[in-house]
Amino acid sequence: MRLDDKKLMTWAKRQHDIAAANGWHGAMASNAHMLALIVTEVAEIIEADRKERRYDASVFEKYKAQMGDDYGFVCFYDAEVKHTIDEEFADVCLRLLDLAWDCHHEDMRWFDDNISIPTYCRTTTEKAWHLIDKELGWGVFQIARCIAFMYLWAEQEHIDLDFHIENKLRYNALMSKEKKIKS
């Protein structure tokens, strides 16, 4: 597995800009606060897995033409993607990318460091706990390992993580615009 440095940095900046525009970087946004938000997203992976909420890619292909505009995309996303394990994987990665940009900006380096998921991690809960207990932190090395771990875990779960990160970024940006229109 090889992480795409340029793509990850682009996403990190995009996510950080969206988060800042939405006011998600207020006075409470310390590193500890951001790590706690990542932990809550990891918990949502466990919840989605427990409820067996998975994204069905065939539905996307079926309705792709009908959701060409932003409104159609948001409706589709809300109905078919929200609260799936696939979306929660993207949410964890986006929180990690936001933390990476917040802490390290352009100095962030992405590497996979030959990461593996330990053999004792057989269930979703065990993998989630390993991520939180053994990998998570705000250092360059820790964030990079967490992203690599998420890609490896997504691969095991047959989740197209790039697809879900791109779509969640689009959704977040559209929700940001909608929020501004309503206020």
Walk through the language-model features, giving the residues of each:
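Flexible "arm" and connector segments at domain edges
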Residues: 1-183
